[in-house]
């Protein structure tokens, strides 16, 4: 699997009003006490990476009632302001780069329905932020994920 960044992919169809971001990439940690998450939480390598076109605090205010956030409170670890780029496309690139780090677990929601979280990854905050930086500066193609360690490493 690889990530190719096409020219203007991140900026197509977006324009920032002076001083206002087009959206945000956010990196969250969960406060969930689900036993299936305990081992990952213990390593410090469990983050949700998402995007929002509204303020992140507004987006996550009802996390306890949303399976997207594992029906638990979340902590904001990082917020990246997106200026003159499409935050959804940016998120898609991040998720593609982290494909091998996506967690594969089943959880049961408050209604007893089984679900599979999709935007949660077995990486730490610093790795997630570094990936975002490398996508923005155009050097992400020089890196790959070490799937065992869950860190980004330079190719070659």
Features from the language model and the residues they span:
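Non-catalytic accessory segments flanking enzymatic or RNA/DNA-binding domains
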Residues: 1-156
